[in-house]
């Protein structure tokens, strides 16, 4: 892994035929193994920046690398090195919690025994083991959010993007999430 897990130089992103400038020359460097937060008011472009760094959007101009790979020219390599939990939980409500995590692992071409063990571990870590075999449409909003965060970790990515990770979590779940993040950072996750 390079010295910087994430580097961005003069990122500009416009919408509505160039009339709305969501990002205007953002540059940043995130050292490998460090926690980095984007702070700003609503509508300041934080989510847009995360979407660019995770290859969901392309910048209008500027350049960025994640794990040493260009987000525009090498999006598949970037995706192999990241986990992403967006602002809203994106779980399949017709699958169980376990099936959601297993699906993510298999889509990442991970071997089945690893996926089963990792899914069970994450369900336990996020306080969802008792609900592992329930259809997720029966989950509360906070439970869905925790499952979404767990899904971002199935592939044990070296870089993790969390967009407002504590939204919808109760105080105990927030504390538990920060403890998990601390353990990940201690293990080298950026």
Residue positions per predicted region:
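Conserved catalytic motifs of ABC-family nucleotide-binding domains
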Residues: 156
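Walker A (P-loop) phosphate-binding loop of ABC-type ATPase nucleotide-binding domains
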Residues: 41-45
């Amino acid at each position: 892994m390079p010295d910087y897990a994430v580097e961005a130089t003069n990122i500009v992103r416009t919408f509505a035929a160039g009339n709305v400038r969501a990002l205007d020359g953002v540059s940043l460097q995130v050292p490998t193994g460090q926690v980095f937060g984007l702070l700003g008011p609503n509508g300041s472009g934080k989510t847009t920046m995360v979407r660019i760094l995770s290859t969901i959007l392309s910048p209008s101009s500027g350049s960025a690398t994640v794990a040493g790979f260009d987000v525009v020219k090498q999006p598949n390599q970037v995706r192999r090195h990241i986990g992403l939990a967006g602002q809203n939980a994106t779980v399949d409500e017709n699958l169980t919690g376990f099936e959601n995590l297993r699906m993510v692992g298999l889509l990442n071409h991970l071997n089945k025994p690893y996926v089963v063990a990792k899914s069970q571990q994450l369900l336990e870590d996020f306080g969802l083991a008792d609900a592992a075999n329930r259809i997720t449409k029966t989950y509360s909003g906070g439970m869905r959010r925790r499952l979404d965060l767990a899904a971002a970790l199935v592939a044990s990515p070296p870089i993790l993007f969390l967009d407002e990770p504590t939204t919808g979590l109760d105080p105990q779940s927030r504390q538990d999430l920060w403890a998990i993040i601390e353990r990940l950072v201690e293990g080298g996750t950026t």
